[in-house]
């Protein structure tokens, strides 16, 4: 059995392509089932977000499994198999495990260390598990990956610092006010940066936000989309008299907020603090305003310094997390190898106990006059002899779980002791067939 991961992400395909290969939420369960029907696929999980579509699978043969996954993606989205090959990357074995761990912990995200992907990966796994397309290996591996990511985020500050300009703007406001929930904010500009600023403000707990834009209809559309208020640019002077935070991101040629405007409203505001954050280039807010008492003015350079410092902190945390991944891979491999070791040990014990039982039957026939106590003593001692004889072989078998050639050595081990253990691969295939029948039955009854 082999672990294969095929990923279409921000490194392998631009956003135009990624938009075309994203599964709708309501189509994911059926997608899991469709892929699982393929004989070469023993287990599968599909992750589909705005930045990546990935298929994780346990396959019987790497080349066959890889092809069927690529064919599945091609058919799902109307591409040729070669197109999927060109826009994706393939990871196998340890590389696939590393990829899963990096993705789940946010090391492979556009925004380094973001936590949303952890929830998305957890949801993808739970959906696959509930659909019936995971088995022994993925049920263990994905729980391991999720636990690893949670630990990575709790033990490092990788997600604690702002690494986008719009998010950093809100962080600067927090430095002045602390909690923002009770504050009023004005966002000037209804473009992409304006909407990102709005989303970060709402995410900080602020509900009282006003969108201001030169074109009122654009402000109205954005405001209604996010359930906030809106106003025209001409209302800005009066809004400045009562607001606490202003984030400006227009493409205006002249200053939107001037020194004279702020001096006028500062007399009305008295000692109330006002945070002005200018993320526009050219600037929307006239320089020098922060010389006025209780007016805090930040421009894009101030934000860049904060973002750069925070990114360095995240990169250091990412290096720490990445350094822990090899140990996780080793732990997974040892666990997988034990799947092959346990049946061998079980078969060895069964053979030994059968020999002991046959020996006791022979003793009973040849010494029929033994008392019950004498029989129990003999039985106890023969079992003790067997356990002592098995101690070292079992220890050696367990140590094979860390051996790269464990399959070959386990086969030799079985030949030496003339035992035949259950093959984990055959067991996985039988389990897959059973789950596939359950899925098919569920489809039939659901259709009816």
Swiss-Prot record:
Q: Which UniProt keyword terms apply here?
A: NADP, Oxidoreductase, Porphyrin biosynthesis
Biological or metabolic pathway of the protein:
Porphyrin-containing compound metabolism; protoporphyrin-IX biosynthesis; 5-aminolevulinate from L-glutamyl-tRNA(Glu): step 1/2
Active-site residues are 50
- One biological process GO term for this chain? protoporphyrinogen IX biosynthetic process
Amino-acid positions noted as binding substrate in the UniProt annotation, renumbered to this chain: 49-52, 109, 114-116, 120
Asked whether the UniProt record includes Metal-binding among its keywords, one would answer no
Catalyzed reaction equations:
(S)-4-amino-5-oxopentanoate + tRNA(Glu) + NADP(+) = L-glutamyl-tRNA(Glu) + NADPH + H(+)
The positions annotated as site (Important for activity) read: 99
Gene3D superfamilies listed in its UniProt record = Glutamyl-tRNA reductase, N-terminal domain, NAD(P)-binding Rossmann-like Domain
The miscellaneous comment for this protein is: During catalysis, the active site Cys acts as a nucleophile attacking the alpha-carbonyl group of tRNA-bound glutamate with the formation of a thioester intermediate between enzyme and glutamate, and the concomitant release of tRNA(Glu). The thioester intermediate is finally reduced by direct hydride transfer from NADPH, to form the product GSA.
Per the record, the domain comment is:
Possesses an unusual extended V-shaped dimeric structure with each monomer consisting of three distinct domains arranged along a curved 'spinal' alpha-helix. The N-terminal catalytic domain specifically recognizes the glutamate moiety of the substrate. The second domain is the NADPH-binding domain, and the third C-terminal domain is responsible for dimerization.
What quaternary arrangement does the UniProt entry report? Homodimer.
The family annotation for this protein states:
Belongs to the glutamyl-tRNA reductase family.
Known role: Catalyzes the NADPH-dependent reduction of glutamyl-tRNA(Glu) to glutamate 1-semialdehyde (GSA).
Protein name in the entry: Glutamyl-tRNA reductase
**Native source species:** Staphylococcus epidermidis (strain ATCC 35984 / DSM 28319 / BCRC 17069 / CCUG 31568 / BM 3577 / RP62A)
């Amino acid at each position: 059995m082999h672990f294969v991961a095929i990923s279409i992400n921000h490194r392998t395909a631009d956003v135009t392509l990624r938009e075309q290969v994203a599964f709708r939420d309501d189509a994911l369960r059926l997608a899991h089932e469709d892929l699982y029907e393929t004989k070469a696929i023993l287990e599968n999980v599909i992750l589909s977000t705005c930045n990546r579509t990935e298929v994780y699978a346990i396959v019987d043969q790497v080349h066959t499994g890889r092809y069927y996954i690529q064919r599945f993606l091609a058919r799902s989205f109307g591409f040729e198999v070669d197109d999927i090959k060109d826009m994706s990357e393939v990871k196998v074995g340890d590389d696939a495990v590393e990829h899963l761990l990096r993705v789940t912990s946010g090391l492979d995200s556009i925004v380094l260390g973001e936590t949303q992907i952890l929830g998305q990966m957890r949801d993808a796994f739970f959906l696959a598990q509930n659909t019936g397309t995971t088995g022994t290996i993925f049920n263990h591996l994905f729980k391991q990956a999720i636990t690893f990511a949670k630990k990575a985020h709790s033990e490092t500050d990788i997600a604690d610092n702002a690494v986008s300009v719009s998010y950093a703007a809100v962080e600067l406001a927090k430095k002045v006010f602390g909690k923002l929930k009770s504050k009023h904010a004005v966002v000037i500009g209804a473009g992409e940066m304006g909407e990102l600023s709005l989303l970060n403000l709402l995410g900080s707990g602020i509900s009282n936000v006003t969108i201001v834009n030169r074109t009122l209809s654009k402000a109205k559309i954005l405001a209604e989309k996010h359930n906030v208020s809106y106003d025209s640019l001409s209302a800005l002077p009066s809004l400045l008299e009562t607001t606490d935070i202003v984030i400006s991101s227009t493409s205006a040629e002249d200053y939107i907020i001037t020194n004279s405007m702020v001096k006028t409203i500062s007399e009305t505001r008295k000692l109330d603090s006002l945070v002005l954050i200018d993320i526009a280039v050219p600037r929307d807010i006239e320089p020098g305003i922060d010389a006025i008492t209780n007016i805090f003015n930040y421009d894009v350079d101030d934000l860049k310094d904060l973002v750069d410092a925070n990114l360095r902190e995240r990169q250091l945390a990412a290096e720490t997390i990445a350094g822990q991944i090899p140990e996780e891979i080793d732990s997974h491999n040892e666990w997988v190898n034990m799947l092959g070791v346990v049946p061998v040990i079980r078969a060895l014990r069964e053979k030994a106990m059968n020999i002991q039982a046959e020996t006791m039957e022979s003793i009973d026939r040849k010494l029929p006059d033994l008392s019950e106590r004498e029989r129990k003593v003999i039985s106890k001692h023969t079992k003790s002899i067997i356990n002592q004889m098995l101690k070292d072989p079992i220890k050696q078998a367990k140590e094979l779980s860390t051996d790269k050639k464990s399959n070959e050595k386990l086969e030799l081990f079985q030949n030496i002791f003339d035992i035949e253990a259950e093959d984990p691969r055959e067991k996985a295939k039988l389990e897959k067939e059973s789950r596939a029948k359950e899925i098919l039955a569920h489809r039939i009854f659901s259709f009816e």
